[in-house]
């Protein structure tokens, strides 16, 4: 990005604005509170407290045009091989809508719709049995997305099926889950793109034995033959996924099977509809009015021009408490890259460390550092305008904290006592859902997916591979024999010492 024609001008704006007070920016642009705000379907965004002005934004958009961002969106949606290292398309958008005339994308959409019909039929069959509980086994993209959506949208009471998620290879996770369930009234779903994932295979074996066989086991995999063979699952209970959908983008596919079981098939389809509606915004809206583009460019601005190494996400709706963990994978696995598409080194920093939690709990943990620490941490504050729980006063108090915290972080407060002085200048974006509906959550997740893609295009990196996760898995596999007491050649001296401790 630093090699683009417009970077010097952008850098000059950063030098000008780095020390600017956010109240001064608001005073200089009196219409800023509304001009930097957007309503896209059920989502409202306000960027007024970010540390840029119109001139800086124009410079950002100029670089986005130089990077052919609009063309990059076309290539993504049309099913071109945007995942260049693995020579694949990244057609997660086709799982929820058909927005182009590209045959590849249209075929993917039709294929996904057929599988969704199969999934709906399996759900009807399950609901007609005496099964009351589902154990979903997966990890990473096979777990975080489904777990987030199921937790956010599950009914407070009256659910026909209860869905439990197990991801960690630590046996305690499976033990605690199964201890509360009756094997005679439980079914299991094993989700793995390759069905070679150690955690899923080990946990799947435990679940298979606990259930007494495969009669109530289902699987989702891009390798359905291996899935069926590994646990003797009938082919009719194995749903496919595809190599043109990355794990962290897969909740819209049959990976969403546990979502549909938890919230109902109709509401699962509404989730997809909400995502497709935001997809249309991302694909068809001019850059300057495109919220996904603005969100992604804001992240680039804060990372590369203002030097922020971390980004916080605060969800002021308890039902979205798992969103920060989901976004950690979506953002950091997609953007944690050090080489460009052609294999050359990047010319700027890439991903920030993403983290966060649920408000107001986080105000009593890490907000001290946000307000008075030496690091400036940009943040997203996410809340809901309307809440359907019966405790209206609580919701009012919750939203009062969103307003108060974003104002305090931005404006600060002087004091003669340095211990009680707040420097301010902490930028934030406020995102409000009209209500936490399937459509709104689908749109929100879609927005973050496209924001990630924007950042990858600006940095010239591949958002759709994840080779960085492989080395540790390979070493773990090699060390298993040594941990079991078998002879093994372990070269690393620290690892040898740790092995001796673990083996006693």
From Swiss-Prot:
Coiled coil (UniProt feature) = none
Q: Which compartment or compartments is the protein found in?
A: Cytoplasm
Active-site residues, as the UniProt record annotates them: 333 (proton donor), 364, 473
User: Which InterPro entries does this one have?
Assistant: G6P_Isomerase, G6P_Isomerase_C, Phosphoglucose_isomerase_CS, SIS_dom_sf, SIS_PGI_1, SIS_PGI_2
One cellular-component annotation, GO: cytosol
> Which of UniProt's keywords are assigned here?
Cytoplasm, Gluconeogenesis, Glycolysis, Isomerase
The stretch of residues making up the signal peptide is none
Instruction: Write the Enzyme Commission number(s) for this entry.
Output: 5.3.1.9
Tell me the domain of life. Bacteria
What the entry lists under Pfam families is as follows: PGI
Annotated pathway, please?
Answer: Carbohydrate biosynthesis; gluconeogenesis; Carbohydrate degradation; glycolysis; D-glyceraldehyde 3-phosphate and glycerone phosphate from D-glucose: step 2/4
Disulfide bond residue pairs: none
Which Gene Ontology terms cover its molecular function?
carbohydrate derivative binding; glucose-6-phosphate isomerase activity; monosaccharide binding
What reaction(s) does this enzyme catalyze? alpha-D-glucose 6-phosphate = beta-D-fructose 6-phosphate
One GO term under biological process is: glycolytic process
Q: Which HAMAP family match?
A: G6P_isomerase
Which family does the similarity line name? Belongs to the GPI family.
Cited function: Catalyzes the reversible isomerization of glucose-6-phosphate to fructose-6-phosphate.
Q: What's the protein name?
A: Glucose-6-phosphate isomerase
Q: What is the lineage of its organism?
A: Bacteria, Pseudomonadati, Pseudomonadota, Gammaproteobacteria, Lysobacterales
